[in-house]
């Protein structure tokens, strides 16, 4: 039976179309995905992301554990409480189990935020490894998570919390601070400024209501996906999976190769691929015509066929955009097979849109 977040009643009350997502009943939209998308690009939107998994790790061995488990290096957070780090969690073959964010907290513990779709893989792995290493680990299912995104996100938080939000509003991207009992990270998945607010689950409905009263537009999974695609952000299970490495998913920048003696899980496989070169790479495409290039569509190239990993109509650009996995040696003559016809495409470097501006 699908699970419900603490904000389920708010979604139903607002007329959301609710769908099953990774075992959770989540809002797809509240009437207009387009209006929700545009609200985030031009004003402020609100997302329930309480289905994501929050796991807290603490104790003398927590740092060493995460340095072994993650491809990026939490040593980068040393002495920087409130700082966040984006990383992949890999399998032994170098494949991406999940992408996640880890925060160093004020008390020298760590907070890991991972995806809902991988909850049953990531959390048990962290808890099991923590237990073996004598690290205190806590699955924080007592928490909810609300993302406030858009150019007016900061002003809405200031309006609601005043001076109490000063530290959070002073944060740069990938930093976090407290707003009372709220853990506020200046992070998001939309390509706009914003905050992800982690708070006690029983306080989430009241905060959601206050945010909507302040003018934030409730947004569903549909807008979340079109916004992240415009921002050129990967989605687990699409741009990356356990058979795809960070080097094949445009995430090589998240792998900390130094120091060379840090033996994180998947390192040997990645080093082998790094020496010989990845067979695939992830690119952005602007596709001619009006028909969207959907996930799974074939991409013809001068070096063999690739595949669309995510594709949709871009509300901001007014035409189809896509992310695609193509042979590493492909250089041009991009064509996408749409309904048995080939549509010409132009390779671009994502993001397509960032902070409301077209980048391609």
Swiss-Prot record:
GO cellular component, one term: glycine cleavage complex
Pfam families: GCV_T (PF01571), GCV_T_C (PF08669)
EC number(s) per entry: 2.1.2.10
Swiss-Prot/TrEMBL keywords: Aminotransferase, Transferase
Gene3D superfamilies: Aminomethyltransferase beta-barrel domains, Aminomethyltransferase fragment, Probable tRNA modification gtpase trme, domain 1
Organism superkingdom: Bacteria
GO molecular function list: aminomethyltransferase activity; transaminase activity
GO biological process: glycine decarboxylation via glycine cleavage system
Catalyzed reactions per annotation: N(6)-[(R)-S(8)-aminomethyldihydrolipoyl]-L-lysyl-[protein] + (6S)-5,6,7,8-tetrahydrofolate = N(6)-[(R)-dihydrolipoyl]-L-lysyl-[protein] + (6R)-5,10-methylene-5,6,7,8-tetrahydrofolate + NH4(+)
Record text on subunit structure and interactions: The glycine cleavage system is composed of four proteins: P, T, L and H.
Function, in words: The glycine cleavage system catalyzes the degradation of glycine.
Family statement drawn from the similarity comment of this UniProt entry: Belongs to the GcvT family.
Protein name: Aminomethyltransferase
Organism: Halorhodospira halophila (strain DSM 244 / SL1)
Name of encoding gene: gcvT
């Amino acid at each position: 039976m699908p699970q419900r977040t603490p904000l389920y009643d708010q979604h139903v009350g607002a007329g959301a179309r609710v769908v099953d997502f990774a075992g959770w009943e989540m809002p797809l939209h509240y009437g207009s995905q387009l209006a929700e998308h545009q609200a985030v690009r031009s004003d402020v939107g609100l997302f329930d992301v309480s289905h994501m998994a929050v796991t807290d790790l603490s104790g003398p061995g927590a740092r060493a554990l995460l340095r072994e488990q993650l491809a990026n290096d939490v040593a980068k957070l040393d002495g920087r409480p409130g700082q966040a780090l984006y990383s992949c969690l890999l399998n032994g073959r170098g494949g991406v189990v999940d992408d996640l964010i880890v925060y160093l907290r004020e008390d020298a513990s760590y907070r890991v935020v991972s995806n809902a779709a991988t909850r049953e893989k990531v959390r048990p792995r962290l808890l099991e490894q923590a237990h073996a290493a004598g690290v205190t680990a806590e699955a924080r299912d007592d928490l909810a998570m609300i993302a406030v995104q858009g150019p007016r996100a900061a002003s809405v938080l200031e309006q609601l919390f005043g001076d109490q939000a000063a530290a959070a509003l002073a944060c740069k991207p990938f930093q976090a601070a407290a707003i009372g009992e709220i853990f506020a990270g200046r992070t998001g998945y939309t390509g706009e400024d914003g905050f992800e607010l982690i708070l006690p689950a029983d306080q989430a409905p009241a905060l959601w209501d206050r945010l909507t009263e302040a003018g934030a537009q409730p947004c569903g999974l549909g807008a979340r996906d079109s916004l992240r695609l415009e921002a050129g952000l990967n989605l687990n299970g699409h741009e990356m999976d356990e058979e795809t490495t960070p080097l094949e998913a445009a995430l090589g920048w998240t792998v900390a190769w130094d120091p060379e003696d840090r033996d994180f899980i998947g390192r040997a496989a990645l080093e082998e691929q790094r020496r010989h070169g990845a067979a695939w790479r992830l690119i952005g495409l602007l596709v001619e015509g009006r028909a969207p290039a959907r996930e799974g569509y074939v991409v013809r190239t001068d070096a063999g066929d690739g595949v669309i990993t995510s594709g949709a109509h871009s509300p901001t650009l007014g035409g189809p955009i896509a992310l695609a996995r193509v042979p590493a040696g492909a250089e041009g003559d991009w064509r996408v097979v749409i309904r048995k016809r080939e549509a010409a495409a132009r390779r671009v470097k994502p993001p397509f849109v960032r902070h409301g501006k077209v980048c391609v």
